[in-house]
């Protein structure tokens, strides 16, 4: 949630993009409600990673979590240093199995959560994959490669911004590794780098 939302201006000059209402509800509220439905169990905590949006926005997000019977936690990403860096900001909430969702993506979370796997990434075919992180799959549907915003075509399966991890701790180990070793793509710490490391280790 820490981005500036420039593509939705002028609306985002006064309201952060995830809080813009769609059919009467903020985007982020619809997203967490959908995820709560497919999780199939009570959600203990919803952590929001935001920019400097102010106390009113923070309180709105906490109320969204509380409506679902969950604790709401707020973390601030002071600099836009990438998706992995954003998750690092919420490290204190990263325990056990987790769902990570990018709240500024306009889609409905209509899927089945398969908790048998170590991790699940939801993808969608797109016409212009150069604007997204994409995955390459083998014949069995398993991921063979992650590519962040490819400039030449490698796949049209874009990562839509929802992930499930059975072990948040394993993910954090990889995020800490890439940050401690200053491994960047496009000047930022990318989640896809951590995911590729996990894939190579058989996760």
Residue ranges and their predicted role:
Residues 108-134:
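Conserved donor-nucleotide/metal-binding helix-loop-beta segment in metal-dependent transferases, i.e.
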Residues 5-10, 130:
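Short N-terminal binding/cap micro-motifs at the start of the first secondary-structure element
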